[in-house]
Amino acid sequence: MTTVEQIIDQLKTLTLIESSELVKQIEETFGVDASAPVGGAIMMAPGQESAGQEVVEEKTTFDVIVKDIASDKRVSVLKVIRKLTSLGLAEAKEFTVSLPKALKEGISKEEAAEAKKDLELAGAVVDIV
């Protein structure tokens, strides 16, 4: 019989009060918390994955796609497009003719959200992908 099996056999003989005292002493001795995680979630150790479960990496770069611009808001959207990019007036106007089109590519989530907010306030329909 291994040491672990012997310990398990001894644990089986403990009363509920003795078990509670054992848990308290283990917590104090090793500086751990034996209480269940909040919400009852089970945490897996880093690197452990369930069989058949795919690892999904969080996306770090985003594209801002202008899908449509209301005709009465075109001028205000042009101003925002010029502010967000280095496009001149003619290039910005040409950009708005053939939509949907990516305005900014490979940018951070925060930058994409800010660009989307500015464009939508100006009157554009925008997606972040």
From Swiss-Prot:
GO terms for molecular function: mRNA binding; structural constituent of ribosome. It is found in: Plastid, Chloroplast. GO terms for cellular component: chloroplast; ribonucleoprotein complex; ribosome. Signal peptide: none annotated. Keywords: Chloroplast, Plastid, Ribonucleoprotein, Ribosomal protein. SUPFAM superfamilies: ClpS-like (SSF54736), Ribosomal protein L7/12, oligomerisation (N-terminal) domain (SSF48300). GO terms for biological process: translation. InterPro entries: Ribosomal_bL12, Ribosomal_bL12_C, Ribosomal_bL12_C/ClpS-like, Ribosomal_bL12_oligo, Ribosomal_bL12_oligo_N_sf. It comes from the Eukaryota. The keyword Transferase does not apply. PANTHER family: 39S RIBOSOMAL PROTEIN L12 (PTHR45987), LARGE RIBOSOMAL SUBUNIT PROTEIN BL12M (PTHR45987:SF4). Belongs to the bacterial ribosomal protein bL12 family. Homodimer. Part of the ribosomal stalk of the 50S ribosomal subunit. Forms a multimeric L10(L12)X complex, where L10 forms an elongated spine to which 2 to 4 L12 dimers bind in a sequential fashion. Binds GTP-bound translation factors. Forms part of the ribosomal stalk which helps the ribosome interact with GTP-bound translation factors. Is thus essential for accurate translation. This is Large ribosomal subunit protein bL12c.
